[in-house]
Amino acid sequence: MGKKKTSVVQSDELPVIEFRYAEPLFQFVCHPEEPMVVSALATGHVLCHRYDAELLTEKLREARKVQEAVKVEEKKQTLWTVVDVDAADKHPVLPSGVTLLWRTKRHKGSVRALAIDHDGKHVYTIGADNVLKKADTHSGKVVKKVTLDGGSKVTKLVKSATHDFLVMGDEVGTIVVLDSNDLTTKNTLTKIHGGDAINDIFQFCKRSVYKYISLGQTTLAYWDTREPKMKQPKKNSGNQTEEELSNIMCSDDQEDEILCGAFVDPIEGDTLVCGMGEGTLTVWKPKKNDLEDQLTRVKIAKGESIDTVISTLQDDNCVWCGCSNGLLYKVDTKRGKIVEIRKHSGLDEVGMLDLDFEYRLVSGGMDKLKIWEVPKEENSDSDSDSDINDDSEAGLSSSEDSDSDSELGSGSESEVESDASSKSDSDLEECTGSDLPGDIEGSEGENNSNDDDNHDDREELWKELDQPTSDEEEPPKKRSLKVKDKKNKKFKKNENNLSHGITKFDGL
């Protein structure tokens, strides 16, 4: 008797907005309390956009109605709002429902990592210049910065959702814990994954708010961000110190690269999933074997890599997986099945995932970022007023390219810090009111990163882009939480920062 074919649901859900970037997008993060998204580019620019989710959803619904009425057969045009983002464009014309709050040339070279406070008050960035900057999300001004020691490039930056510290991982497997107030170093852990790069970091709050999990090469490790109180000699498998061994627990070799991970329910912390280089999603149970090894695996996409994963935070035992084939897979981890598939891009991989303040899925690759509509069943439970018409058309016809000017304010250049070494901290452009943004001065330097071919590997871009360029700086703002008893869930979301990826750092 043959195997039963499991039917996978090809989703009819569409994005409400799509940002298309002229330069490669390396990182993005959603504000946890307001409809804002901060994006960081390969050129060192950081931009912040605000979007009106209700208006954009209404525009999408109207476009669907038009498609129904005219019965258009062609499916080449998009129904959702599209925003072209060019960091060099100082006077962008944006469609209604979208506002550019600020843009800045924050780092020399590319932006390596990006993080935000659990309340959205501050945003943290680190560039190829190894300068870590903390900026006020409301004003966009840099309030603190520090140049990090060592030549290793940072691959991951996470802000604790509960305490005032940052956790940072680099290319050689070093974890640095910093005080998020003054950016001073509090603790350092070395060679966690045998000297391999840190692919992902997330909090293990069920065990302790100080416990974190890191992924690197073919192993998973969990450790304490605090310094060990005493030496507890353990079996030495290499040249690690006793203190390190007493503070780090490492899994068995998985014989496949572990690229990303997340807890299905970050508060419960009973099930952990990891995206693998060969296209499977491995399932781990801390209570079963203390994370020594995976228990089961779910086949997602053979021959592709799972580059990013995030919980849906909907109490449905599901996670979203972003794959190198440009598809988004919703996986029921309890049943071990794919329950929904969405298409992010036909050319680019999905390298980043996040949830916005109303739990919309946000997917990002090197050329675009999409904020997806909330499914009808989820939206009806929330207290938001954005009613989404969940018709069964999957068509992509009918243009929805409203070019009405958004409200942008004139950029004000504000001297944020007086460090002689930081031109890039002085030029900020804040966009509020109805004026177009003013100029942000500062030479662009040598940024050879116009990504004409979206198939270019990130590792090649790093080589080209990690060259010192001139700096500028700018301001951010804030956003608000949803009412539906989701505050605790949002707390979960903030524990899993979404940017990831070892491949883009290879060869540096």
From Swiss-Prot:
UniProt keyword annotation of Metal-binding present: no
Gene3D superfamilies, A to Z: YVTN repeat-like/Quinoprotein amine dehydrogenase (2.130.10.10)
Keyword Membrane: no
GO biological process per UniProt: positive regulation of transcription by RNA polymerase I; ribosomal large subunit biogenesis; rRNA processing
Protein name: WD repeat-containing protein JIP5
Compositional bias segments (type: Acidic residues): 380-393, 441-454
Source organism superkingdom: Eukaryota
Basic and acidic residues composition-biased segments: 455-466
Family the entry assigns: Belongs to the WD repeat WDR55 family.
Low complexity composition bias: residue spans: 407-419
Swiss-Prot/TrEMBL keywords: Nucleus, Repeat, WD repeat
Subcellular localization: Nucleus, Nucleolus
Spans of repeat WD: 62-105, 106-145, 149-188, 193-233, 253-294, 345-382, 431-472
GO cellular component: a single term: nucleolus
Basic residues composition-biased segments: 478-492
Gene: JIP5
PANTHER family noted in UniProt: UTP15 U3 SMALL NUCLEOLAR RNA-ASSOCIATED PROTEIN 15 FAMILY MEMBER, WD REPEAT-CONTAINING PROTEIN JIP5
Region (Disordered): 376-508
